[in-house]
Amino acid sequence: DFVYMLHDGRKGRLHGIRSEYTLLYFYDPDCPDCRHTREMLAELPTVVALVQSGRLQIVAFYPDGEAEAWEACRNIIPDTWLNTCDGTEELVVREKLYAIRAVPSLYLLDSEKRVILKDTDYNKLDAWLNGPLSASL
C-alpha cells in the first residue's frame, strides 16, 4: 500500500481504490516512451471498455516528486485515470515498493492489490486482458 496525491492536494491510498483491477502506470511527463505508452493505453479497446465499466482503474503515478513538472503535465493524463504523484516524499521509490528500473512501467493488480503483471508493457497487458476477461466484456 502507498499514499498518493492528487492535483487538488487530496491524498489517497492504493488500497482505497475499489476496482476489480488496478493498473499502475509509472511515468515521467518528458519521456517519449511514456507518452507512447499512455497513448496506446488510451486507445486499446479492452482497456477503454474496462475503464468505462469501472472494472479497471488506471493510476498514472509520477514518482519523481517534482511538483512543478507534475503540475505542468496535468492535462496529458486522460480524465478517466487517477493522475497522481508521490504523496510521501518519494516513499514508493525510496522504499522500493515497486521495482521501477525505468519509465514507463506498468503493474496490473487484482482487487486485493496483488501483482498480476509486473513491469510489463501495453502489448502484454492487452494480451492478458484479452485472455481471461474477453468473454465478460
What do the predicted segments below correspond to?
Residues D1, Y21-T22, V103-P104:
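Short loop/turn microsegments at loop-to-beta-strand junctions
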Residues D1-H15, W128-S134:
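N-terminal "domain-start" segment that seeds a small globular fold
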Residues D1-M5, H15-S19, V47, E68, ...:
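N-proximal helix/coil linker or "cap" segments that precede and/or mark the start of modular domains
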Residues Y4-M5, L82-G87, D119:
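Short acidic-hydrophobic, aromatic-tinged amphipathic segments that line or gate anion-handling sites
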Residues G12-L41, Q57-V59:
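Short active-site neighborhood of thiol/selenol oxidoreductases, capturing the structured segment around
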Residues R35-N75, E89-E95:
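Structural microenvironment flanking redox-active thiols in thiol-disulfide oxidoreductases
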Residues Q57, T80-L82:
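Conserved beta-strand segments of alpha/beta enzyme cores
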Residues D79, E89-L133:
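Thiol/disulfide oxidoreductase modules built on the thioredoxin-like
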